[in-house]
Curated annotation (Swiss-Prot):
NADP(+) binds at E84, G133, A134, G135, G136, A137, N157, R158, T159, Q160, A161, K162, M220, G244. This is Shikimate dehydrogenase (NADP(+)). One of its GO terms (molecular function) is NADP binding. It holds the Pfam family Shikimate_DH. The lineage of its organism: Bacteria, Pseudomonadati, Pseudomonadota, Gammaproteobacteria, Alteromonadales. Involved in the biosynthesis of the chorismate, which leads to the biosynthesis of aromatic amino acids. Catalyzes the reversible NADPH linked reduction of 3-dehydroshikimate (DHSA) to yield shikimate (SA). Homodimer. It comes from the Bacteria. The keyword Nucleus does not apply.
Length: 279
């Protein structure tokens, strides 16, 4: 579709609900830092009309969008082109409207996770990693984790068949395996909780033996206080606990880089969000 010259390029995040989204603040801060001229808004898409909502946005100078729950799988189906990461994740959180009007989909969730792990831990090479959960958040994280240089990824899930299905998808990309969640006995260097258990104050049913003094525990959830998973990990002597706020900012930075071809700094935005969260 033809573009109108000299207009501020529009970006947005689509979700339902969407009022809680921090994406407009994050991308506005990224734009200011990098000297980019753009607008970024939150769009509440009807549950049964995401495609129509996005296409209307694209037809009105929409250049790109983030996608959050519950539309990531619908966004995947909407795309004319997919990155390898999006293809394997089976979900899209970043849409780009190309010059010829085609829609390209990417998934930056796992990139945000790995970037935050590296920001906190440095080199990930050689680490033994346990991933709890086999839903969309887990699936979007497997390839970036395997590409990060870790020694081995073990996936556990309440329903083991789902964990085994993920292993089948990614087995050719690195050393990845699954275990019954009740059979995990050894300690790990990094344990990642990709489930939403902390939102209800619960902890996945894994053995305390998975945690040693050197273990880093990472919860994709975040809040004003430590998450239930991270509190549990601390009580068992985990060496470090990290919540998912940095992952949120990291995935946004990866999306911004795809659209604008410039990589913004994560730290100032993360510090601002953390200050507001605990303030």
């Amino acid at each position: 579709m033809a573009r109108v010259e000299n207009m501020t390029e529009r970006y947005a995040v689509f979700g339902n609900p969407i009022g809680h989204s921090k994406s407009p603040k994050i991308h506005t801060m990224f734009a200011k830092e990098t000297g980019q001229s753009l607008s970024y808004e939150a769009i509440l898409a009807p549950i049964d009309a995401f495609e129509a909502s996005f296409k209307e946005f694209a037809a009105n100078e929409g250049y790109g969008a983030n996608v959050t729950v519950p539309f990531k799988e619908q966004a995947f189906s909407l795309c004319d082109e997919l990155s390898e990461q999006a293809q394997l994740a089976g979900a899209v959180n970043t849409l780009s409207v190309l010059a010829d009007g085609k829609i390209r989909g990417d998934n930056t969730d796992g990139l945000g996770l790995v970037a935050d792990l590296k920001r906190n831990l440095g080199d990930l090479c050689g680490l033994q990693v346990l991933l709890i959960g086999a839903g969309g958040a887990a699936r979007g994280s497997v390839l970036p984790l395997l590409h990060s240089g870790i020694a081995k990824l073990t996936i556990v899930n309440r329903t083991q068949a789902k964990a085994e299905a993920l292993v089948e998808i990614f087995t050719s990309y690195g050393d990845v395996t699954s275990l019954p969640i009740t059979h995990v006995g050894q300690s790990y260097d990094v344990i990642i909780n990709s489930t939403s258990s902390s939102l209800s104050g619960e902890v996945p049913n894994i053995s305390p033996d998975t945690i040693a003094p050197h273990t880093v525990c990472y919860d994709m959830m975040y809040g004003k206080q430590s998450t239930a998973f991270n509190l549990w990990a601390k009580s068992l002597g985990a060496g470090q606990t990290i919540d998912g706020l940095g992952m949120l900012v990291g995935q946004a930075a990866a999306s911004f880089s795809i659209w604008r071809k410039v990589t913004p700094s994560v730290e100032p935005v993360l510090a601002q969000l953390r200050s507001e969260l605990i303030g």
